[in-house]
Amino acid sequence: MQMSEPLSQKNALYTAMNRFLGAVNNMDQTVMVPSLLRDVPLDQEKEQQKLTNDPGSYLREAEADMYSYYSQLKSIRNNIEWGVIRSEDQRRKKDTSASEPVRTEEESDMDLEQLLQFHLKGLHGVLSQLTSQANNLTNRYKQEIGISGWGQ
């Protein structure tokens, strides 16, 4: 990164990760009885996503209920905080290294910055969507148990 970039741009990914982690932690603290989320449909969320044409909506439509949504968000939070299992990473590296074409060092260096920018933009977008999901789940839980105006 260049030194002339504003501080907000330098920490954009860090800020997005913190927003997501904060939203999931808030969700985790609010949802005192996660089993109440079982069999609660995502219909309200689906209607909202159809109106906004959200790029991640197809993932949420595949989920059966709010409990699976809750579990998924907590799992993603744990992966961000603690990392993924190393044995899976090593196995994937072995599988992909055999199929990767051989590149020269110059080609690799030129592509690295573009590749990093592509993935950072994607990661930032995904983190924003996940933060929104965690906040929506928290609000929906409050509605379901009748405390929708509390804590706001």
Swiss-Prot record:
Nucleus listed as a keyword: yes
InterPro entries, per the entry: Lipogen_MT_Stabilize_sf (IPR053719), Spot_14 (IPR009786)
Localization terms from the record: Nucleus; Cytoplasm; Cytoplasm, Cytoskeleton
Primary localization class, coarse: nucleus
PANTHER family listed in its UniProt record: MID1-INTERACTING PROTEIN 1-B-RELATED, SPOT14 FAMILY MEMBER
Expression by tissue: Expressed for a short period in the cells that will produce the enveloping layer (EVL).
Residue numbers spanned by region Disordered: 87-109
One Pfam family of this chain: Spot_14
Entry keywords, A to Z: Cytoplasm, Cytoskeleton, Microtubule, Nucleus
Function: Involved in stabilization of microtubules. May play a role in the regulation of lipogenesis.
UniProt keyword DNA-binding, yes or no: no
A GO-annotated cellular component: cytosol
Family label: Belongs to the SPOT14 family.
Biased composition (Basic and acidic residues): 87-105
GO biological process, one term: regulation of lipid biosynthetic process
Name of this chain's protein: Mid1-interacting protein 1A
Gene3D superfamilies to which the protein is assigned, alphabetical: 6.10.140.1610
